[in-house]
Amino acid sequence: MGFSKRPLIKKNSDEERIEWNEPLQAGELRKSQIITTFGPGAVVDLEKFSGIIASADLWERAYKNSNQQKRIPESAKIHDRNLEHLLGVRYFLAPKTMESNKNSSNHLSQDVYAFRFPYMHFCPACGRLDVYWKLGSGDNDFTTCRHCGKKHKLIPSRFVAACINGHIEDFPFNWWVHRGKTQLDHKLKIRFNNTSGGLESIIIHCDTCGKERSMEGCMSANALRGYKCKGKRPWGGKSKEVWEKDCIAGMHALQRGASNVYYSVIRSALTIPECRDPFYQLLDDHPELLKLYQEIKKTPAVSMTGLLGAINSDLKEYLTKYGLCAVKEKFERYSAAGNEDYSYEKLREDEYDAFCGGDNKDKNFRIETSAVPEAFTPFFKKIVKVHKLREVMALVGFRRVLSLDPSDANNQETEKLKAFNRELHPMGYIEPSIKKTEWLPGINLYGEGIFFQLNMETLDKWAAIVRDSGRYRAMYQRIPAGSAMQKVFSEPYVLLHTLSHLLIRQITQECGYSEASIKERIYSTYPGRVKTMAGVLLYTSSTASDGSLGGLVRMAETDIIEKVLKNMLDQAKWCSSDPLCIESTTQGYNSLNYAACHACALLPETSCESFNCLLDRVAVVGRHDETGNISGFFELGDLGSAAEDF
């Protein structure tokens, strides 16, 4: 990441600004962090300064400047046909890196840029508060205060202002201290009282007029009412050309390191092999062939045959064997299939079919069926060892202030979200690139896991009992209208999701992985769709191409997984918060959990795909007391010898 060494002050009509050249190494981030926590538009404390990660379209320039052809090399592009189809892009692009050591898994980024942000800094010696290029002097680090002359590292402002449309700027200290009026030429100072550590101890003082005001109350919902958003997008640079005009959203004061400054929006897919025509598989592996065909398809037949045959030996063989007409028909069918609507539901259904379809030895999808323990055959149809998988993770955008999609808001949030600009951001999030690109930021993750397919006959029997009881009717009614949770909710989903959490908590006690390192994918029949699903994938993944070490896969051995399942059920019967937990139907966000709390079923947020919602231990183990008689899934079959352990 970098910013320029030499400052060049330029005058604008209403402010001074600074331009930079000659990149300076500012700090280091892991490649996966740039796709998740610290993606384009995120504010991050780097080694050299506090900065905002630059727009992703700058990655393209970095790649093109690194080779004589001035284009992104094919080796840098990440392909996953299903995810490309879903998101409407041609490929995914990882942050440009260099290996620090051939024998090391560490990678250093050379071409991911960051701009210094926030602009407002203060001198720890005299307290002067101003934009850093006016306040400090120095070759590139602004270590000398122009006001007091003392050499100190300037400290970036703790506060920023942002709106739900993604715009972010310096907190308006001048406007704040003058209570709604901006006095451009007034000089500000900041001081800290030692009376407490709260916001009331931070005092903003105007040297020019003598007014002062503490920061107490600046974080309240209406603190910046009357302050108009300027549409600033500093991750695109300081030029006003990247500002968005006429934003009507209210501004909110945030602390620059707070989680609500940046919520990344991630989409991912597992790379699964397809039982496809070998010609279509060739086009999957070499997407540049389709691009070439589209460019030359109107040329004369002789010229087209020569051009296509020259670029790829396999394609030349097809032309020789089947002729140009047959090959053109294949190209057209492949192209038409790529233009069909493809949904996230279909993507999950394709993944589910791949896990249920038998053993596979594909380089990115190596699975092996493991025998289901005899005691658990009424409940599980299949248990699969996932020796290797590849997950393509893409950053599709980000949000500020609120994490939910504008359409997912509950009644308390509706007022804030009325100003979200759907015209500019139709998907409900801010895109990672300011300039339109044909790609999205993405990375490959490799790992291992275990897949559990439930017995559909037992599941249907349990679901019918629970549905008749109406146990989850209130849970469904509490889900925000139009939200992702509403789109997946069903009685089986609650069971599968809870089972997944309980299994992860138990497996981490047996295999040494932490809960945060294991993720879940729930495969449950989507409401309104014909395809039936009932499965859970637990997996771990990392950017290392060799994946992980096999510890999780080993848990799928028949004798080991039998022990894990027995212990899981034993643990699930009791919670340290019982009887309050087991009797509860109003826990968690929006009361979307029943018998599930931190002591028994909740996981780190990185592990859960539904924000630790839609959980209920009773779905797994049942509950029988004077207040209710509710059957759990694992009570519907004969556990045989397993029952002796309970």
Please give the residue ranges for each predicted region.
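Intrinsically disordered, low-complexity regulatory segments
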Residues: 146-148, 181-254, 258
